[in-house]
Amino acid sequence: MGQKVNPHGFRLGITTDHVSHWFADSTKAGQRYKDFVREDIRIRQLMSTGMERAGIAKVEIERTRDRVRVDIHTARPGIVIGRRGAEADRIRGELEKLTGKQVQLNILEVKNPEMEAQLVAQGVAEQLTSRVAFRRAMKKAMQSAQRAGAKGIRIACSGRLGGAEMSRSEFYREGRVPLHTLRANIDYGFYEAKTTFGRIGVKVWIYKGDVTSKELAQQAAAAPSRGRGASDRPGRPGGADRGDRRRRTDRPAAEAAPAAEAPAVEAAAPAVEGGQA
């Protein structure tokens, strides 16, 4: 049976970017690739435990030689910052103890939480934990996302839905969710609801539209600032103007030389070759 690949990994370099930005080629203990991966996992686990009410959508990690930068994208920055920055200082201290390096902590607010798949999945899971009917929670989340501007949304819940003896999966979809279109900007989120009768997994796909228009705008804005190169030749980026090669009907008229000149050119050619020899 068919399986669904993670939309973020499927579109890396096209519509999505890595959430960890660093490079490791050292063989020293603590600076190897596997050490950094383990450290990233622990940092994200630290952000997820005890911060459920903060609505953390994404944690980005960037490393330099002696510093680690952690960007927290949250729907409620006040909870992460705390009173007079006390909570932010506590998080920074725990991160410095975990990494052993200086930590730069940036707290960024999510402007539209209804369009963030991770936050939508977390919201549905919290309602399931509060014994809200799963169909009502799913449909309410889909309506909120569509009002916020989503072109399509799909929500899937798996587990002992409604406390049933047999676990099953159910999903609802509104609008278009083209999972195989690489230019489609699709956000994906997953969260687990811990209920009294077991865990229920919630998956959310949100289709925000194609990125072609955005890419064209970025290319148009970056075109004047480029240096000299093949792409700066006049008329070539658009593909419509190719200079003399465009009008092929003009060539016969230009090549129609008098017949009397042809023997003279041919006769002069051996003399030139003999002179060079």
UniProtKB/Swiss-Prot annotation:
One of its GO terms (cellular component) is cytosolic small ribosomal subunit. CDD domains: KH-II_30S_S3 (cd02412). SMART domains: KH. Transmembrane segments: none annotated. GO terms for molecular function: mRNA binding; rRNA binding; structural constituent of ribosome. Residues 43-111 form the KH type-2 domain. Residues 229-244 have a biased composition (Basic and acidic residues). PANTHER family: 30S/40S RIBOSOMAL PROTEIN S3, SMALL RIBOSOMAL SUBUNIT PROTEIN US3C. This is Small ribosomal subunit protein uS3. It comes from Arthrobacter sp. (strain FB24). The lineage of its organism: Bacteria, Bacillati, Actinomycetota, Actinomycetes, Micrococcales. The gene is rpsC.
